[in-house]
Amino acid sequence: MRISRPGIWYLNPYLSDTNREQLTQGNPNLESEKNHSFDLQFGSFAQKLSYNISVGYNFTDNSIQSFQKMVTDNEVAGLQNPTGKQVLYTTYYNMGKTQSATFNGYASWSPFTSTRLVVSTWGGYSHFSDGQGLKNHGWSMSVYAQLQQTIAKTWTASASVFKMTPGVNLQGKTMGYFSHTLSLRKSMLNDRLNITFTADNPFQKYYHIKSNSSGKNFATSSTIKFIPQSFSIGVSYRIGKLQSGVKKTERTITNDDVKSGGGGSGKTGGDNVGS
């Protein structure tokens, strides 16, 4: 069993009223999720080909889900100057019962010493229920691939793509996503100096994120448009020599049991599977 504590944005009682017709508020009374999972893995690691495959099943009886409903704004605690009109109110509850069957795959292939191909994929079928008749289910999948080629020893070119299908949540779904990256690295001074040119989504001028949500007496659809392109130059220089040796063990504590997310004004539904 894995316990996931709600992140600060889920707990924050601050009322986001930037859009007076779509209000969002955290819930400080949330409890930690209790997740149960079963996994089966198989892998092989060799010089030219390495891969790992896993299948799993997990379920949560008190999962944290965002929930939307239509209310009159004078019912919302903390709202300044209510008018009595209908608004879409979003908050979070331990109301979800989730079940997911998943598949993960990873492969790294080097047909030549100068060429490397990496592919990673995830897929799953999920079922959401609030225990009171509200249900949603569906498939989702993501694929990442990267091809890296060394040219004349000091030049390295790489291209990568990422594709994610639409994700589902308790009250709706979100649109899928696609991105691509090109990079070129030049190594000099015996690999001490590296200059990297990177282009993110150079062939995609605009991107639209769409989401749909529905409930009792309402249905919403939203679209966010933004420019995904970026171009950058990175320079790194290594000082000194790399030396092998015994490194003293450092004791650290890492808290990775926090469920992230939440906090978006007008957020349309709970955590998406596949996002």
Question: What do the predicted segments below correspond to?
Answer:
Residues 1, 43, 52-56, 106, ...:
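Transmembrane beta-strands of outer-membrane beta-barrel proteins
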Residues 1-36, 57-84, 202-216:
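Surface-exposed extracellular loop regions of Gram-negative outer-membrane beta-barrel proteins
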Residues 1-5, 36, 44-46, 57-61, ...:
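Transmembrane beta-strands of outer-membrane beta-barrel pores
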Residues 19-26, 35, 83-92, 101, ...:
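Extracytoplasmic loops and strand-loop junctions of Gram-negative outer membrane beta-barrel proteins
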Residues 25-27, 31, 46, 50-120, ...:
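Outer membrane beta-barrel strand-and-loop segments of large Gram-negative receptors
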Residues 29, 39-43, 52, 104-108, ...:
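Outer-membrane beta-barrel architecture
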Residues 137-275:
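Conserved C-terminal beta-signal and adjacent last beta-strands/turns
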